[in-house]
């Protein structure tokens, strides 16, 4: 374990939407340091959402992330030779990180042609409380609910 906590690095808000969440999302999508490709994918997906007309793309994006953020998760805890799945609350930073990760993973597993389409459709579905990423959150919550009996092992 490290001696002291690593300082949290300040990240710059993105130039178009002036949002730190967008910057984090771009960094999470990025593969092999290709940031411009990652930006093209995300901005393309938001433009795709804009084109659907009902609501602004950025608002759908924010709602999708909010809908996928988990409140509880289970962590393994060994007590006297048995391993228990103990439900714990998720801290705000991890909540956001998990939501971004789940959205990206679900998008990559979809079978539309381009990543822009996949991400746009996954964001749209998550904003409307459907889709694989939202299901992942529901599954995590269900696991926490099922293991509520072990909540007293929290640390």
From Swiss-Prot:
One of the primary rRNA binding proteins, it binds directly to 16S rRNA where it nucleates assembly of the head domain of the 30S subunit. Is located at the subunit interface close to the decoding center, probably blocks exit of the E-site tRNA. Pfam families: Ribosomal_S7. SUPFAM superfamilies: Ribosomal protein S7 (SSF47973). The keyword Cell cycle does not apply. The gene is rpsG. Belongs to the universal ribosomal protein uS7 family. One of its GO terms (molecular function) is rRNA binding. Part of the 30S ribosomal subunit. Contacts proteins S9 and S11. One of its GO terms (cellular component) is small ribosomal subunit. PROSITE patterns: RIBOSOMAL_S7 (PS00052). InterPro entries: Ribosomal_uS7 (IPR000235), Ribosomal_uS7_bac/org-type (IPR005717), Ribosomal_uS7_CS (IPR020606), Ribosomal_uS7_dom (IPR023798), Ribosomal_uS7_dom_sf (IPR036823). GO terms for biological process: translation. This is Small ribosomal subunit protein uS7. HAMAP family: Ribosomal_uS7_B (MF_00480_B). It comes from Aliarcobacter butzleri (strain RM4018). Gene3D superfamilies: Ribosomal protein S7 domain. The keyword tRNA-binding applies. PANTHER family: RIBOSOMAL PROTEIN S7. Keywords: Ribonucleoprotein, Ribosomal protein, RNA-binding, rRNA-binding, tRNA-binding. It comes from the Bacteria.
């Amino acid at each position: 374990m490290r001696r002291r906590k690593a300082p949290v690095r300040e990240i710059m808000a993105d130039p178009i939407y002036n949002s730190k969440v967008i910057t984090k999302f771009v960094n999470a999508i990025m593969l092999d340091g290709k940031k411009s490709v990652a930006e093209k994918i995300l901005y393309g997906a938001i433009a795709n959402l804009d084109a659907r007309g009902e609501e602004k793309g950025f608002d759908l994006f924010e709602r999708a992330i909010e809908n996928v953020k988990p409140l509880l998760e289970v962590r393994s805890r060994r007590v006297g030779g048995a391993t228990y799945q103990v439900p714990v609350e998720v801290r705000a930073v991890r909540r956001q990180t998990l939501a971004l990760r789940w959205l990206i993973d679900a998008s990559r597993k979809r079978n539309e042609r381009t990543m822009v389409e996949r991400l746009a459709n996954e964001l749209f579905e998550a904003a409307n409380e459907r889709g694989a990423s939202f299901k992942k959150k529901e599954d995590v919550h269900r696991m926490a609910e099922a293991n509520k009996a072990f909540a007293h092992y929290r640390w």
